[in-house]
Amino acid sequence: MSLRPGRAHPLAASPLHTPLPARPRPQLRLSTSTSCAAMKSYRLSELSDAEVGGLKARPRIDFSSIFGTVNPIVEDVRMRGDAAVKDYTVKFDKVALDDVVVRVSDLPDVELDPAVKEAFDVAYDNIYAFHVSQKLPEKTVENMKGVRCKRITRCIGSVGLYVPGGTAVLPSTALMLAVPAQIAGCKTVVLATPPSRDGSICKEVLYCAKKAGVTHVLKAGGAQAISAMAWGTVSCPKVEKIFGPGNQYVTAAKMILQNSEAMVSIDMPAGPSEVLVIADKYANPVHVAADLLSQAEHGPDSQVVLVVAGDGVDLGAIEAEVSKQCSALPRGEFASKALGHSFTVFAKDMVEAISFSNMYAPEHLIINVKDAEQWEDLVENAGSVFLGQWTPESVGDYASGTNHVLPTYGYARMYSGVSLNSFLKYITVQSLSEEGLRSLGPHVAKMAEVEGLEAHRRAVTLRLQDIEATVTV
């Protein structure tokens, strides 16, 4: 996920977490450009360990002032419910709503252009196929005779899915979040997305929502939408877990609410979108530039990193392509600003290149080198990996089948992207026979005695006494 007009991604593990100040990057600029797409350049062999470590730091997001804005919204929605959501929708979206929530079952089928419908149908099928394959069979293990243990799977009963509006419509995010919820069997699925100026919802988002089993649509965005799903209102069901992207205010609301009395969890912390591209001399400069820009265009806070692996790479051709393509993009101004705080790294070989990538832990990792598949085993930290010259990051964003809600800000070191598991919970079950308790009980009683927990010990020994009495009789 990312703080962009689109998918959101990880940034802070708890509402109490504020990112530490970023270490300054080494001032070893090897090349500059007067183009709209200038990127700083560094050679790893010339940097100290501290300087290399500084390159992994992301631009800092200061949530202190944002919390001051979001907290009153969270509390207002808690107290006034639908009325507060309507007021904030007028204030921020300039829309006066009659109804905040609509039931998807009450909506008519959505008519789309045939080519658009086919594209989303293909995406749905691929996303469904990949996520349904993640189902695991239940297994029962008999650890010792008469002692059986297993883990059973249950869905999270109610979930909230946030699909941003902003400067771009994102029906792809509706699929990425709703399809695994559908497979998991979540009974209540609330999709929140900002309404357009006439109070309607993007028809492509509605099509995807209906196809993927969404039950309710909340016509609201921002912190007020997150708050409505977390607290519940007269018209909006309360959810148990909230997923999805958003701007800094959406992220702040998720951070605040996950440790509040609302008792709601969130998918992951979130920060700006990012990509790291590893390219060797065989990579097509046109493709490399396009991949860098596909992330940079998300917004000025996005970050792109180019890692040049080995000798023979025509960096000048890549820079020229970046400048050429950037100037032709409708969102070129966003891309240019993002490139202004992005950078290029020179690695002596692929081992050093992937080692740097593992330290950086990117949301998206593109390995555009000859025989890319052979390097997969070295990858330790990345949200999603794209191997080879024919695998642009865009396919993962839309329709290859993998999920595009991914950890950013370096959280790929310890977080995974959204998957079927994100919508499931696992419950352990144990069942002992009389023989099983006779075998295991004395050991449990002894451990309880060591820990000084007499009631624990007696829960076992009293049963063992009953067993012995039965045997004696």
Swiss-Prot record:
GO cellular component: chloroplast; cytoplasm
Enzyme class, broadest EC rank: oxidoreductase
Compartment(s): Plastid, Chloroplast
Annotated residues for binding of NAD(+): 162, 224, 247
Region feature Disordered, mapped onto this chain: 1-28
Catalysed reactions, as listed in the record: L-histidinol + 2 NAD(+) + H2O = L-histidine + 2 NADH + 3 H(+)
Involved pathway(s): Amino-acid biosynthesis; L-histidine biosynthesis; L-histidine from 5-phospho-alpha-D-ribose 1-diphosphate: step 9/9
Binding-site residues for substrate, renumbered to this chain: 273, 295, 298, 364, 397, 451, 456
Assigned protein family: Belongs to the histidinol dehydrogenase family.
Protein name: Histidinol dehydrogenase, chloroplastic
Taxonomic source organism: Oryza sativa subsp. japonica
Lineage summary: Eukaryota, Viridiplantae, Streptophyta, Embryophyta, Tracheophyta
